[in-house]
A protein has these predicted regions:
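GHKL (Bergerat-fold) ATPase N-terminal catalytic module, capturing the glycine-rich phosphate-binding loop
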Residues: 1-174
Length: 174
């Protein structure tokens, strides 16, 4: 039988080999490489749904008159697939919170907040926070440029090669 010690225990965070964890996560959830496109389009659709819902209650929205759309294009020279949307966008803090933490869903948080405020938001798709990472099945590097719907927001670029680190840098936005 062990004696009780009157000392506070040390608290430690789990450590993970992110590249290996991402690989296991992505390849166990997705069996077909093409699924990444569906996941990115789903994220874009959620971003548009969020901005539609937000415009019902918020007045200070950047680019109120912008057409809500999702565009998929290809840059063969750079070997890039580009998925663009005119949805809610993300702040630097959103990028850190939602892309810097695997399985952390900004959509789930938005849905919970909307339900708490009695808003209808059932058409949001992504709620598990892992679909975005399926892009690493087909890409050596993933880049995301985003600017929040909020007035005076800066644009930020998030990029990673799927290893243990990612980068965030402010960028000019067209």
């Amino acid at each position: 039988m062990s004696k009780k010690v009157k000392q506070k225990p040390e608290v430690h965070e789990y450590q993970a080999e992110m590249q290996k964890l991402l690989e296991i996560l992505v390849h166990s959830l997705y069996t077909e490489r093409e699924i990444f496109l569906r996941e990115l389009v789903s994220n874009a659709s959620d971003a548009i749904s969020k901005v539609q819902l937000t415009t019902l209650t918020e007045k200070n929205i950047l680019d109120k008159d912008v057409e809500l759309e999702i565009t998929i294009s290809f840059d063969e020279d750079k070997k890039m697939i580009i998925v663009e949307d005119s949805g809610c966008g993300m702040t630097k803090e959103d990028l850190l919170e939602n892309l810097g933490k695997i399985a952390n869903s900004g959509t789930l948080k938005f849905l919970q907040q909307a339900q708490a405020e009695n808003k209808t938001a059932e058409n949001l798709i992504g709620q598990f926070g892992v679909g975005f990472y399926s892009a690493f099945m087909v890409a050596d590097r993933v880049e995301l440029v985003s600017r929040s719907w909020q007035e005076n927001s800066k644009a930020w670029q998030w990029s990673s090669d799927g290893g243990g680190q990612y980068e965030i840098i402010p960028v000019d936005y067209k």
